[in-house]
Structure formats: C-alpha cells, structure tokens
C-alpha cells in the first residue's frame, strides 16, 4: 500500500505525475537529500511478508506463521530483524476448539546504521499517516504519532474459540 501525492502547508505539493506513480509502484528511491545516508522512496509505503506452515492430521490442524511488516527498502530486506507478528493456531486439539497464541514485536524498528528508526505507521510528510481520528489503522498495539513519537511494543495475545457442534 502507498499514499502519495497531495499537498501540505509545510511541504507544498508532492510529486504526482505518471512517472512518479511508476516510481511508487516499484518503490524506487526518491531524490537523495544532502546529509542523508540514503534516498527515501516517494510516498508513504506499508507492506507485509506473510509466511505460514499449515499441517492437518485427521481432524486436527496446526498453523504456524510469521508476518514481517515493512515501510521502506530496509524493512523489505529484513533489516528490522525480529519485528513482526509470530503466531500459532491449534484447531481441534480440544474438541471443536481453536486456540491462538500470538507474539507481536516492534522493538527493533530497523535500528541498524546508517538507517534511522522506522517508527511504524509514521511518516514525516504525511503526519496523519495510517490513522483515523488519531488512532492507528490495522493494529491496536502500535500507537499513532498523537500519543508517542516512538512505538516499540512487545505484546502477547491469547485467544480461544469454541465451535458449536451442529450434529
């Protein structure tokens, strides 16, 4: 996903030509600014790598997954290391029940020189970022810029769901 174009009082108009769209589509670097170690891509990008393994034996099923999120090329290349959502789902290990364990980590935030921290869901050109009325869209455990300039989190989540047997 990418937000791009538009204008702000602080920065004026952002690039919005078809050529700029193509750069956004392939996440090409934008202009290199003096004093910066790397060029930023145009727009505000979010992406996710979603890996999982699922195994079913008789009526039981297990699913192990990792969702690696990124906002720039460094995250795309896994420079933010262990950040992401790790999960385990067990279905029917207890009759008609699904059990869920999840661990969310956002503490690395690509703290690897020469890059600066990612501060997930934040963007200096689009200060509202991925939010609605000040609340982050998509993940309740990551704070928006209204509440914090940084948002490292470690969260454990547990869920259980029972399915009614309709026999």
Feature map (PLM): residue ranges:
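Internal, well-ordered domain-core segments that constitute the primary functional module
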Residues: 1-11
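Acidic-aromatic/histidine active-site loop/patch
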Residues: 15, 25
């Amino acid at each position: 996903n990418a937000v791009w174009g538009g204008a702000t009082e602080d920065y004026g108009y952002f690039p919005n030509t078809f050529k700029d769209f193509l750069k956004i589509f392939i996440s090409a670097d934008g202009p290199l600014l003096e004093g910066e170690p790397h060029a930023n891509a145009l727009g505000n990008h979010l992406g996710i790598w979603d890996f999982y393994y699922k195994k079913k034996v008789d009526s039981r099923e297990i699913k192990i997954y990792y969702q690696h999120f990124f906002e720039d090329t460094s995250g795309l290349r896994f420079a933010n290391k262990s950040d992401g959502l790790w999960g385990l789902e067990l279905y029917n290990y207890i009759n008609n029940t699904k059990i869920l364990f999840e661990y969310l980590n956002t503490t690395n935030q690509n703290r690897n020189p020469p890059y600066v921290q990612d501060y997930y869901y934040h963007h200096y050109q689009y200060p509202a970022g991925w939010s609605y009325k000040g609340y982050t869209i998509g993940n309740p455990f990551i704070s928006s810029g209204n509440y914090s300039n940084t948002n490292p989190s470690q969260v454990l989540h547990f869920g259980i769901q029972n399915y009614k047997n309709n026999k």
